[in-house]
Amino acid sequence: MQLAKQYIPNDYEPNIYALWETSGALEPTGVGKPYSIIMPPPNANGNLHIGHALDMNLKDILIRYHRMKGDDAVFIPGADHAGFETWVVYERELTKQGKSRFDFSRDQLYSQVWNFVQEKRGNMELQLRALGVSASWKHLTFTLDDKVINTVYDTFKKMWDDNLIYRGERIVNYCTKHQTSFADIEVEHKNEKGKLWKIAYPTLDKIGEIIIATTRPETMLGDIAVAVHPDDERYKKLIGTRILLPIVNKEIPIIADEYVDMSYGTGAVKITPAHDPNDFEIAKRHDLPLESVISPEGKMINVPAQFLGLTPVEARTRVLEALEALELRRGETEIEHAVGHCYKCGSVIEPMIKEQWFIKTQSLAQPAIDALKKEEIAFYPASKRKELIAYLEQLKDWNISRQIPWGIPIPAFVNENDPKDWIFDTRTNEQSIVVNGTTYIREEDTFDTWFSSAQWPYIVTDYLTDGDLANYFPTDMIETGMDIMRAWVSRMIMLSLYRTGKLPFKEVYLHGMVNDEHNQKMSKSKGNVINPMELVAEFGSDATRMGVISGRAPAQSQAFNKGSVIAARNFCNKLWNIARFVEAQIGDNHQIVDLEPQTPADHWIIRQLNDAANNIAVRIEQYRFSEASETVYHTIWDDVADWYIESSKTAINRPLLSWVLATSLKIAHPFAPFVTETIWQTLNYTDGILMREAWPTPEKFDPIAAEQFEQLKLLVAEGRWVIAELPGNKKYRLLYGNDSLIADNQDTIKHLMRLEAIEHTDQPRGLRLAAANREAWLDIDSETLYQHQENLEMRLAEARQKLAGLKKRLENPTYVEKAPAHLVEETREQLAEQEKIITRLVSELEVISLK
């Protein structure tokens, strides 16, 4: 088989992936040191986005590298039922059909969503394959598989028995549109402009008043007290008395509580415990009643007739009008404050009293905190470890129940005659069960998806059941987005320590968000979401993989740059053309034999590839993915293609040329697996596949000879630069004096510099190539040299003018602080480039002046 003239990724990628899969190369071998990474399960019902492409690519680089290093590497895939996210999508489908969730029973809805997800699930797996994700597909775990549900139930039962589970009335974050609660960490807080209204609450004799300040006047209809600080001299005499709640005309007490900030507002706070978490805690301390005025459907309840059935926003307007009529409004102030929203639909979250299932987190968090303080898990970046400790130290109890039918049912049943009598039972497919003559009704809520996801490391490795992957737990590392460090990483650590006594992984690498080209967060509403499959279709999987990691550092969000994908596509084409050149010299019978370097270029390329293989390995192991990829790019493009391949055209060492290509394919494989495997298979390097080849080990070379080629490079590079700057388009002669290196490598220098001739001389003339520090001159006449000098002086003036403009821009604090970060960085890069140009031009002009 022969390499085609052009590399068209779509012609090869599906077949290459099929080869990996059918050969068993994706599966663990049981030979070597176990190395495992789990896949944060993407939503089974959806398409991958560009963030998934980054996430999966980083993990796949590690897996491919460790396979080649001889480790028994396994990438364990997963698919997430994505409880709430999937439910939102399916509710949209029902709406299109003119139906509602309330038209069906819970069991009917579960069955419908199950079928919906199974239809979509294959699409996600196909996309992961298209990205080249080398996962062990026979170990794929779906978050609703029996083994997942059984483990989740076992954990829930253990927590139940350990008195870590409780059901109680608490303030929860509630989305009235989807009618489900959320944990604190799932609420998306947005800074919004609003108003702080001051309202007078009259004393019972209607002579005096207390002024409170609130951003939500509508909730005053549910006030049960006014709180002041016990040390506030303004209100000390009023503590213990009662005051009149406007509109409702109900007497409520004035209480003292140290929570109140005397310096904020008027120092008097309305207490609405059913709709504010802080007020709820105050009410508990003072044994005050709870009065809900907003229903789960987002309507006003238990309020005067004129407000019944209104939305909170509608009620706000009416309440303010009523207060105006009563002459009880005392002004308003424009403010900016954080407002909680549903992270999926954007609705304002309503704090609401609901009976929910909770996990007591204090005893779970402490072992995790202790392990983190002892640095038993390495974090990249290291600063995130302290951030996670701080989060765990103030962690609240975890609300694990969701009011949606799609998910793992909570295995609990309630006595039909006693709402406080709950039992654990896994017969969740039954509406009711009878135990010792008592009928118990099934809990309708499902688990928060994070409760199962938090157990992912020991579930997918079958650690608790001693399955065939049990030896791969704890996993070696977790790589995920910094945005879910708290929601996922923290909980995996807590639950793994609780269930297994072990940490779930040894290292944590957190990547930042992939933003759009303007460095704005991507969202469907903005229409700026990038579909990686479109990039794969246009540029190929390898280009997408290399492009998406370009310039990335841990935990730093960065703009997506399509230019990086194009550059990576060009790199793949360059690698293909290198292979075609080698194929033309050797054919398709590539047997790697003992190397016999013959020229300085031969010794130099061995040194370069030895160094590259080592540097790439170090950078991968330190999670410096972008730097490793850049090393691959420049080693193959610059060292192999531009220098060695070009120099070898004058003296071909075929066995070494074959080794150079093989080594290039190996170091590039973790980053560009498809094109490298395609070349490897086409040129018949071995009977096996590249994915399972060993990572390159150092080969012997002569360092003196290698350094000689480095000196030749300096000479050629300067000669090329000068010739490119000279007027006209002609070939020049190179004159040299007593220089054995030039004398011994004339053919190579002539070819690389595209010279007319090389001649020895005892009478130097022309322009000396001074930067190379050799006795070498370009044979240039005086007129050409003068024109060259004028051109350089003109370019130097232009460069200095550009430099001044760039400096002025960067000295402007408004630009640096307010311009998009990527533009500021581009300006800094342009400034550095101009400084390099100026240095080069000044140096060249100094040589001419010496002449």
Regions found by a protein language model. Give the residues of each.
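Gly/Pro-rich turn-and-neighbor structural signature
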Residues: 20, 147-179, 186-188, 200, ...
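Acidic, turn-prone loop/beta-hairpin segments
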Residues: 80, 176, 182-188, 414, ...
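Catalytic adenosine-cofactor/nucleotide-binding cores of aminoacyl-tRNA synthetases and other
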Residues: 341-345, 514-518, 522-598, 684-685, ...
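N-terminal, positively charged nucleic-acid-binding surface of large information/translation enzymes
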Residues: 1-231, 255, 272-285, 289-304, ...
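Glycine- and acidic
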Residues: 1-3, 40-48, 106-110, 135-142, ...
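Core structural elements
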Residues: 128, 570-583, 602-611, 629-649, ...
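C-terminal low-complexity, glycine/proline- and small-hydrophobic-enriched intrinsically disordered tails
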Residues: 566, 684-851
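Structured ligand/cofactor/substrate-binding pocket environments in proteins
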Residues: 51-63, 79-80, 148-151, 209-322, ...
